[in-house]
A protein has these predicted regions:
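Exposed aromatic-hydrophobic patches
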Residues: 78-85, 210-216, 283-289, 374
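Short beta-strands within extracellular/lumenal beta-sheet-rich domains
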Residues: 31-42, 163-173, 281-286, 364-378
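Aromatic, loop-rich ligand-recognition surfaces of beta-strand-rich domains
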Residues: 262-268, 277-413
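Short, surface-exposed beta-strand/strand-loop-strand elements in extracellular ectodomains
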Residues: 59-67, 190-198, 395-410
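Edge beta-strands of jelly-roll/beta-sandwich modules across compartments, strongly enriched
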Residues: 98-109, 233-241, 306-320
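Carbohydrate-binding surfaces of carbohydrate-active enzymes
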Residues: 1-156, 214, 226, 230-232, ...
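Aromatic-lined ligand-binding clefts that engage carbohydrates, nucleic acids, or primary amines
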Residues: 48-63, 92, 172-195, 202-203, ...
């Protein structure tokens, strides 16, 4: 049980930027950790408004006057938060954590923090929409090295502060040392340090709920543990286990993209393109006969090269009229006929998660055809696509014959 806490808002350093434009982690010479962006509301908004962050890499939390409002999770393709009534002088904070970096492939250029802009959208009395871009940002740098965590100002844990975002510190004594697993299920999201060593990251969503603690980094007598929790714990308590917990998934909301009883109806629809993909590994590019415009794009997989009843896609990009990749940040999966979420995290949004090693997969035994529908959030001109099958040798279950449908209106079910 932890007896000391260093609340986030009591331990903000001096701002590295006192006023200016939004900057990324790279602009601020930050490789990892968190940035807190702060600005002051200049115009009152009576009633509901929407805060849109373009783009938040990777996990952002929104606060007004220190009160938590909502989160923007890049993994879930989120970009907006519904805001309460805002008054002139209200302080808006956006607390952004960098989750990790990709060191290979085209996705290596992946800046962290808020990479473009922040806007407030609200409705006037005549029902017209107004977008305000927020400017003049303070930026606070919060590195994640042990020294920064140890130097924070700690205070005793009590009923009021035991669930706040920040650092939790405790000491414990050992008569004998050995390997163990630290159970982090009662904490939210963050990192663990033991005796000055960074042990690893945790996130309550799982499936991994424990961190491996090497016995060589423990010592007889007194040991120190610091937990940085960017979302706050349910209870500041951990325990050591003999065995790891690596299969306890706690996702929010539905994991799949097909409602109960929902079946795609393509009768009467005409494909804008049909073709055959090559077998084997590596990216493939397909160009349509002519560009088309629409919001929803459906890929219908008719079979696979391995002649089995399921298919896989690792990554998918759509190309504009100039052959350039369209931004995938506003994308969401409108529908997938089948997703394997039992043998692994292989749901349909893996086709645009920037991870070439993950993939969408249907379940074994579910017959073709298979369908995935991408919602691009607004009409776009699409002239083709780039597709990457699984990375394993031979690209198992890669799509062979396919059709593509594009519409401005949602497909029928």
């Amino acid at each position: 049980e932890f007896n000391e806490v260093a609340p986030l808002y009591s331990n903000l350093p001096e701002p590295s930027q006192k006023s200016g434009p939004l900057k990324t982690f790279e602009d601020m010479d930050m490789g990892w950790g968190c940035l807190l962006y702060r600005t002051t509301i200049q115009q009152a908004i009576d009633g509901e408004s929407i805060l849109k962050v373009t783009e938040a890499h990777d996990y952002a939390q929104v606060f007004v006057n220190g009160r938590y409002i909502g989160k923007i999770d890049r993994i879930r393709r989120e970009s907006t938060v519904h805001m309460p009534t805002l008054h002139v002088g209200d302080v808006l904070d956006i607390y952004v954590e960098a989750l990790g970096r990709i060191n290979f492939g085209r996705a290596i250029k992946d800046f962290k923090g808020i990479t473009e802009k922040v806007e407030l959208r609200y409705t006037l009395s005549d029902n017209s929409l107004v977008d305000i871009e927020l400017r003049d940002w303070q930026i606070f740098c919060l590195p994640d090295d042990y020294r920064a965590q140890a130097q924070m100002k700690y205070e005793p844990v009590n009923e009021k502060n035991q669930g706040v975002r920040g650092n939790y510190r405790a000491t414990f004594r050992l008569n004998k040392v050995g390997d163990t697993f630290i159970n982090m299920e009662k904490f939210g999201k963050g990192q663990v340090y033991v005796n000055g060593h960074a042990i690893g990251r945790f996130w309550q969503i799982g499936p991994q709920q424990t961190l491996y603690m090497p016995g060589c980094w423990l010592r007889k007598g007194e040991n120190e543990i610091i937990v940085t929790d960017v979302t706050g714990p349910r209870e500041p308590v951990i325990e050591g286990l003999r065995q790891p917990v690596i299969d306890r998934l706690k996702l929010e909301g539905p994991q799949t993209h097909r409602l109960q009883g929902q079946t795609l109806d393509l009768s009467g629809e005409q494909p804008i393109h049909a073709g055959t993909l090559k077998s084997g590994n590596g990216w493939q590019e397909v160009r349509f006969d002519k560009p088309v415009s629409g919001r929803y794009l459906c890929i219908e997989a008719l079979n696979s090269h391995w002649n089995r009843e399921y298919c896989c896609i690792s990554e998918l990009y759509l190309l504009d009229g100039n052959g350039k990749r369209l931004s995938r940040e506003p994308w969401s999966v409108a529908y997938a006929d089948d997703e394997d979420v039992t043998t692994g995290n292989k749901n349909a949004d893996k086709v645009f998660d920037l991870q070439e090693s993950t993939f969408w997969s249907t379940n074994r035994g579910v017959p073709f055809p298979h369908h995935i529908i991408i919602d691009m959030s607004q009409d776009q001109t699409v002239a083709g696509f780039q597709i990457l099958p699984r990375m394993e040798e031979g690209a198992p279950e890669s799509i062979k014959d396919y059709k593509v449908y594009v519409k401005s209106e949602p497909f029928r079910y």
